[in-house]
Amino acid sequence: MRPLSIKPTSLDVARHATSVESFGNHRPPISPWHSPVPYLFGGLAAMLGLIAFALLILACSYWRLSTSGDDSGERVDEEKESRSGVKAASAACEEKVLVIMAGDDLPRFLATPAANKCMCGHEGRMVIFKEDGIGAGEEKMGDREKAKENEETTSQ
C-alpha cells in the first residue's frame, strides 16, 4: 500500500475545526422553529383567515339570494297575492315541525302545531253565540255533544 500524503495546510485546517476553542466561540445557529411563538402566530393567522373566508362566503350567498329575487317571477306572484288580499307574511309565519314516526317505510312527516292556548280569553270553555244575539252560553270543552246539540237547535 502506498502511504497517503497529507499536506500540512489541510492538517492545520482539520486541527482548527476540531479544537475545543472553536466550539466555545461559535455556537450552532438556533432555529426559530424551536420556539412555540411562530406556531402560535401561525395558528392565529390560519384561524383568522378561515373566519374571513367563511364571512366572505356568507356575504356572497346573501348577496346572491337578494339579487336573485329581483330577476325571478316573484313580482307577478306578489301582484296576484295583493289582488286577492292574501299576504305573503302569513304564509311565511306558518310554522312546520318535522315529526319522525317509528315503524313505517317513510317515517317523516311535516306537521303544523296546534295552538295550545286560547287567544280569546275563554280558556277551557267553548263559547257559543246565538244567531239572534240574545245571549251567549259557555260550556266546558268536555261537553262537546251538548255544544253540537245547541248549534243544531240554534240553526233550525
From Swiss-Prot:
Membrane-crossing residue ranges in chain numbering: 40-60
Name this polypeptide is given: Protein GLUTAMINE DUMPER 4
InterPro entries, A to Z: GDU
Compartments, record wording: Membrane
Record remark: domains: The VIMAG motif is necessary for the function of the protein.
Placement of sequence motif VIMAG: 99-103
Membrane topology term: Single-pass membrane protein
Ranges of the Cytoplasmic topological domain: 61-156
Region (Disordered): 67-87, 136-156
GO terms for cellular component: membrane
Organism the protein comes from: Arabidopsis thaliana (Mouse-ear cress)
Family: Belongs to the GLUTAMINE DUMPER 1 (TC 9.B.60) family.
